[in-house]
């Protein structure tokens, strides 16, 4: 008789079920705390996984917000989650309680990519000394290689010239701008990280872009959420390769690019770029087991810069061009301002912003309307906190619904319409808005914000300086509704770029 006969399987199944239910009850204890945020009743073990559409959670969150208010709770298998909506709740958590909400959920789901102690990159790193060390290094290195100086501005304007040349090659024919925008922005990141740019037909940049896009799609599916909540499942042989094939291939390509830089590096010379600067820090930290400067972390820091700094900016630019062809009156006003301040010969400069309030307002309104990262990146509480009168225990994952701020009907005059006047006063002067937080807020706000602002202004003004954009003749009007896949991208569209 086998060990697992019919007589023993029944009691074992009952025992396993009882164990899982007890474990489930243990993980639900936080929901019983006084003043814990309300939320839908979770199912045993699964929590609320079946009640939220993770292909696009925004509609689910909007329904739950209407039902439970600006602060509501979910259970993701056994992970407690609180969703924050509206400027007051988001600001209270990320700004006023910044130190207590600056942590990230443990990135166990990314261990297959090389994440581990002392190797967490910057974006997903736990809040602590390693994160501070890497954020400080990244900001210092960006400054040393030109952020806030003319050198980086020149890189961007030169790349903008290459982009304009590629647009001109289309000879006024209909085309999709997304691919060229991706390549231009990725070249700015490549200049910072590797000191080089790729030709737009280079197979490596094409592969890099394809894997980045596919890797982002892998972030939002039900299987991914299950292994995130129960990371032990990733120990199943071959599962990670099946769930995250693009992310693993992306990291392999990053390894190849770093290896090329190591082969050409001369340690006796000043660092050429961020990778060299990081390798110098690795040498300095040799023998220090507490340092986050190591080869494993280098690949993650570089991957962070590419994955976060490339697609977000190029997607925003794609939205900008879409909105220009849908709102030709706005396009004409931007071009008029460009002609008056810059002309049609001189390259745009960051110093021009002070004299171009309408163009700056348009760029801001593109970011607000496009709302490309509607849910931000998850935070985690490092101690018990209170937000809007609700008790949120230590170890709770926080999701900040940035879309609820960028399109808050109590803040914006026309929240669901493209309306550059949101950022202009009665005299036509640019006005900052407190509810404008596309880069998030607090200690974990996007460290690439200054670079992104530079790229958006210089690429956008360069393109509108040289071209007029329109919907191709005979094609239907493109949609203003985006497609959600972690980022919100425009639905596929084409345009015509006619030289001015």
UniProtKB/Swiss-Prot annotation:
Q: Which positions carry the signal peptide feature in this UniProt record?
A: none
Q: What is this protein called?
A: Cytochrome P450 2D14
Q: How does it sit in the membrane?
A: Peripheral membrane protein
GO MF term list: heme binding; iron ion binding; oxidoreductase activity, acting on paired donors, with incorporation or reduction of molecular oxygen, reduced flavin or flavoprotein as one donor, and incorporation of one atom of oxygen
Stimuli inducing this protein:
P450 can be induced to high levels in liver and other tissues by various foreign compounds, including drugs, pesticides, and carcinogens.
Domain of life of the native organism: Eukaryota
* GO biological process: one example: arachidonate metabolic process
Gene of this entry: CYP2D14
Location (main, coarse): endoplasmic reticulum
**Where in the cell?**
Endoplasmic reticulum membrane; Microsome membrane
Q: What does this protein do?
A: Cytochromes P450 are a group of heme-thiolate monooxygenases. In liver microsomes, this enzyme is involved in an NADPH-dependent electron transport pathway. It oxidizes a variety of structurally unrelated compounds, including steroids, fatty acids, and xenobiotics.
């Amino acid at each position: 008789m086998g060990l697992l006969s019919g007589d023993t399987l029944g009691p074992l199944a009952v025992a396993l079920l009882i164990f899982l239910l007890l474990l489930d009850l243990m993980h639900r204890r936080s929901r019983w705390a006084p003043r814990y945020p309300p939320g839908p009743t979770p199912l045993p073990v699964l929590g609320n996984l079946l009640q939220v559409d993770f292909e696009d959670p925004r509609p689910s969150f909007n329904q739950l917000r209407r039902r439970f208010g600006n602060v509501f709770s979910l259970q993701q298998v056994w992970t407690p989650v609180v969703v924050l909506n509206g400027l007051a709740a988001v600001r209270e958590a990320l700004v006023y309680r910044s130190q207590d909400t600056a942590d990230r959920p443990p990135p166990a789901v990314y261990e297959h990519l090389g994440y581990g102690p002392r190797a967490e990159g910057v974006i997903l790193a736990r809040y602590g000394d390693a994160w501070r060390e890497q954020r400080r290094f990244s900001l210092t290195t960006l400054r040393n290689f030109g952020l806030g100086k003319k050198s980086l501005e020149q890189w961007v304007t030169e790349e903008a010239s290459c982009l304009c040349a590629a647009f001109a090659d289309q000879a006024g024919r209909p085309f999709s701008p997304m691919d060229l925008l991706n390549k231009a922005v990725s070249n700015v990141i490549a200049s910072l990280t590797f000191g080089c740019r790729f030709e737009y037909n280079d197979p490596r940049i094409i592969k890099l872009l394809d894997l980045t896009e596919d890797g982002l799609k892998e972030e939002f599916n039900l299987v991914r959420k299950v292994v995130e909540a129960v990371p032990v499942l990733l120990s199943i042989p071959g599962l990670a390769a099946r769930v995250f094939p693009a992310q693993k291939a992306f990291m392999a390509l990053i390894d190849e690019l770093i290896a090329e830089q190591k082969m050409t590096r001369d340690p006796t010379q000043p660092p050429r770029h961020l990778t060299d600067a990081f390798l110098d820090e690795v040498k300095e930290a040799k023998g220090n087991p507490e340092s986050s400067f190591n080869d494993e972390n280098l690949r993650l820091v570089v991957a962070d810069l590419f994955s976060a700094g490339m697609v977000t900016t190029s997607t925003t630019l794609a939205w900008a061009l879409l909105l220009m062809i849908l709102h030709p009156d706005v396009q004409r006003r931007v071009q008029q301002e460009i002609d008056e301040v810059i002309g049609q010969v001189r390259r745009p400069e960051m110093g021009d912003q002070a004299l171009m309030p309408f163009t700056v307002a348009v760029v801001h309104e593109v970011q607000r309307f496009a709302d490309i990262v509607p849910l931000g990146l998850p935070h985690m509480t490092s101690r018990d906190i209170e937000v809007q009168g609700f008790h949120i225990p230590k170890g709770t994952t926080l999701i900040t619904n940035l879309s609820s701020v960028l399109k808050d009907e109590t803040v914006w005059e026309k929240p669901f319409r493209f309306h550059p006047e949101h950022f202009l006063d009665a005299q036509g002067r640019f006005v900052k808005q407190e509810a404008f937080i596309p880069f998030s807020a607090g200690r974990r706000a996007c460290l690439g914000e200054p670079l992104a602002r530079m790229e958006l202004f210089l690429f956008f003004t360069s393109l509108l300086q040289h071209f007029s954009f329109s919907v191709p003749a005979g094609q239907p009007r493109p949609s203003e509704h985006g497609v959600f896949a972690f980022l919100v991208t425009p639905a596929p569209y084409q345009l015509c770029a006619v030289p001015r």
